[in-house]
Amino acid sequence: MIKKIKRSYSNFTALLDYPRIHSGLNKERKLFFFFYTWAFGGAERVHISLLKLFKALDPICFITTKSGNEGFKNEFESNSTVINLGRWAEKVSYKKHMYKKLAKMINKQKSPIVFGGNSEFLYEMIPLLEPHVTIIDLLHNFADFKQGSEWRSLPYTRRIDKRIVLGEKLLEQLKNHYVENAIEESYLNRVEIIPNFVDIEQPFQKKDFNGILEVLFVARNSPEKRFHVVKSIAEKCQKLALPLKFTVIGDFEDSEDMPQNIQLVGAIYDKSVLNEFYKRAHIVLLTSRREGLPMVILEGMSFGLIPISTDVGELNAYIGEHKGNGYLINNPIDEEQIIASFVVKFTEIMEERNELAKVSQNAYDTVKREFSFENFANAYRKTILDSIPAK
């Protein structure tokens, strides 16, 4: 009964919101972004960077799924005209109407560009978009159980004009995905690699690796991030009396079994506040089951934090003991094995403190060299602006 009342209320408020959505569609535009959410996350930070990069074009940004929190709402709204579709992107009958309305509005533009990131709503609208509409899709990573963008977009692959992936590993996954699903190899010519960037705001500052080391874990509370693995690692390190303090930033709840060496900070949306945690920490931790090119690792390295992470996504192209800039842990199915490997690595690090300053410097140098804003901006400007015909 309560759920029914909530749905009815959501439907009612959606109808009240329709005039605002309608008025936001009247202006002539060239660039339309469709993003999944404005909630806390690495992908959303990338999406904000894209909105900032093309702010001069006065883009419109559609949020196509209910966001779990206010997250980066202010940053989205300060860099674009944001329309949060809400129920109009959820309720089937409403959604069908909105597909037609948005497609009609986009089709009326002279040379429109539609850019999507993790938006199932956009994929389902693609059949209504006319041939003169350029469609660009950013694929952050592959998901579990055939639930990700690579599967949801499959029926529309041949209509997507350009596709962006974060690195060679994801490109290889996409190639295999096309082969397995009878997508012609020629469509790989539409795929471009553009790595993320890291905004390095300060010169390298040496860290003191004596005393208790602070391990920073920054993530949203979702299954693939595996916070329970972090808890187990911290608990085992505590039993071994390793001088480590784990600071956790994200929407995680406290519990009776929380190890004493874990401090829960909560979610932080203000980048300047988050940066203060990066500045004081020594190690950035990632325990994810899957990732693309995780921003938290790159951001940590930009402050000289030493990365210790599961070997996921594109990380092994840039990080590893052989590169002297961090540590990757094998990512088998057995989580107990993963936990044990992390604990072994933390134990080794405590015994090799004299090497950590060098690893920290190398981590900083890696992101400064490989993930510059200039490379990111030039690549996206070429991809998007080249799609806009000259007047």
Please annotate each region the language model reported.
Residues 160-190:
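A short, active-site helix/loop in glycosyltransferases that binds the activated sugar's phosphate group
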Residues 44-49, 213, 222-236:
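A conserved mid-protein helix/loop that constitutes part of the nucleotide-sugar donor-binding site
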Residues 11-21, 147-151, 175, 189-212:
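Acidic anion/phosphate-binding donor-loop and adjacent secondary structure
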Residues 275-281:
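Short alpha-helical donor nucleotide-sugar binding micro-motif in glycosyltransferases
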Residues 289:
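Aromatic "clamp/platform" in nucleotide-sugar-dependent glycosyltransferases that forms part
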Residues 306-309, 314, 319:
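Short hydrophobic beta-strand element within catalytic cores of glycosyltransferases
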Residues 81-88, 253-272:
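Nucleotide-activated donor-binding/catalytic signature segment of Leloir-type glycosyltransferases, i.e.
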